[in-house]
Amino acid sequence: MSSESNPETQIKLFGRWSYDDLRIENAALKNVISLKPVYLPHTGGRHEHKKFGKLEIPIVERLVNRLMGQAMNSGSRKDHVNSKNQGKKLKAMRTVKYAFEIIELRTGKNPIQVFLDAIENSIIREEVTRIMYGGVSYFHAVDTSPSRMVDLAIRHIAQGAAMKAFRSPRSLAEALAEEIIAAAEYDRNRSFAIRRKEEIERIALSSR
């Protein structure tokens, strides 16, 4: 009997959450988000030396990898330098697992789908780049590529969780769950990722 017809043999994230019926509404993101069913979000760096290989990494693993490099501070630019979680992937996976359990309890939905909704709401469609003309630099608005959209969304979700957990009684898993739920609901008052998205797009709009 195939795995598709037997629910007991289906591959589920951490043995709990199914990959069935997951949806991505934004057509631009469908080719840059991998929803390949995996039990554990760990591919062992098999795509490291392949161009655009990260697009084949399961989307939950990309969140796990980002948490390893996220410093537990105010989200400074030196996150990778200040992070104390470099290489601690098991710790990061446990954090994501506990966060997903909290999301399921609070929303009653598949936490993978809630995470996908958070990414779609947090993507930055337009940003600014610096252009040099005759020794003078100008800021110019540019469209963001789909791959970078996802990268920035995951980065800001991880930063928002770290900022909520920094010097706070709540754990990183609780902060991550709160940030994902707030981003999925497009709550700019509670989500750092949503506020950051709106700030960058506002700057890009003024630089057109």
Swiss-Prot record:
GO molecular function: mRNA binding; rRNA binding; structural constituent of ribosome
Ranges in coiled-coil conformation: none
UniProt cross-references to CDD domains, sorted A to Z: uS7_Eukaryote (cd14867)
Domain of life: Archaea
Alphabetic keyword roster: Ribonucleoprotein, Ribosomal protein, RNA-binding, rRNA-binding
Biological process annotations from GO: ribosomal small subunit assembly; translation
UniProt entry tagged with the keyword Ribosomal protein: yes
Gene3D superfamilies noted in UniProt: Ribosomal protein S7 domain
GO cellular component labels: cytosolic small ribosomal subunit; ribosome
Quaternary data: Part of the 30S ribosomal subunit.
HAMAP family listed in its UniProt record: Ribosomal_uS7_A (MF_00480_A)
PANTHER family the record matches: RIBOSOMAL PROTEIN S7
Described function: One of the primary rRNA binding proteins, it binds directly to 16S rRNA where it nucleates assembly of the head domain of the 30S subunit. Is located at the subunit interface close to the decoding center.
Family designation: Belongs to the universal ribosomal protein uS7 family.
Protein name: Small ribosomal subunit protein uS7
Gene name in the database record: rps7
